[in-house]
Design a protein with these regions (language model features):
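Conserved beta-propeller blade repeats
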Residues: 3-6, 37-55, 93, 141-144, ...
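Multi-bladed beta-propeller domains
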Residues: 3-5, 24-42, 71-89
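Structural motif
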Residues: 16-20, 61-66
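Coil-to-beta-strand transition motifs
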Residues: 14-16, 60, 102-104
Length: 199
């Protein structure tokens, strides 16, 4: 049936997965709604069937398998890990802040629902910014324990990484290495607006 397609395109846009379905002629069918801001991977299925399977994970979602129907566009949980962690109790959101030279830098901030944004919450800021490596969202028991106990976990995607391609990578290497540190400092300075404070 030429009206449906087995073709899915998975790309990272602003450090998170964006998945789209296409027909065989290359025309777009739809953008697939993912469970949240995170990483999708491992797409597979049989051409004779209408389902495609994929994995999804982020800072509040343990790696979970989903079944996607190419005809209806609906996704359902296929295999869920036996982890005592309720993702519905947490928020993982993407923001953009301004670095020293005016560059907009993406950052994912994760915390427990009901958190008082009073600037007094313990916060971990984790960044890398080097070797063309992209920091993409993934579940970690250590991070889960941190946010479960009231902590905030923030991951800025510093220049030097691979999130925006070669230009972004080059913007944080060699003579531009100072940008990496400026990006990290700007992330730390952004957070006291609502989440934590600087000492």
């Amino acid at each position: 049936d030429s009206s449906t397609s087995r073709g899915l395109g998975d790309v990272y846009k602003r450090q998170i997965s964006v998945v789209e379905q296409y027909k065989y002629d290359g025309s777009k069918v739809r953008q697939i709604t993912l469970p949240g801001v995170g990483s999708a991977s491992g797409f597979g299925g049989k051409k004779s069937e209408k389902e495609i399977y994929f994995g999804f994970s982020n800072y509040i979602t343990p790696s979970t398998s989903y079944k996607y129907n190419v005809e209806t566009g609906s996704s359902d949980v296929y295999i869920k890990p036996n982890v005592k962690f309720n993702s519905e109790d947490y928020i993982s959101e993407q923001v953009f802040y301004t670095s020293k030279d005016g560059t907009k830098v993406p950052m994912i901030i994760t915390y427990k629902k009901g958190l008082k944004k009073n600037g007094k919450n313990p916060t971990i800021v984790y960044g890398y910014g080097g070797f063309n490596i992209s920091l993409t969202p993934g579940f970690s028991p250590a991070t889960a324990a941190w946010i479960e106990n009231g902590g905030v976990y923030a991951v800025p995607n510093l220049r030097g990484g691979g999130e925006y391609g070669k230009k972004w990578h080059d913007g944080g290497r060699q003579f531009n290495k100072l940008n990496v540190f400026n990006d990290f400092i700007a992330a730390a300075e952004y957070l006291p607006v609502s989440y934590t404070h600087l000492r």
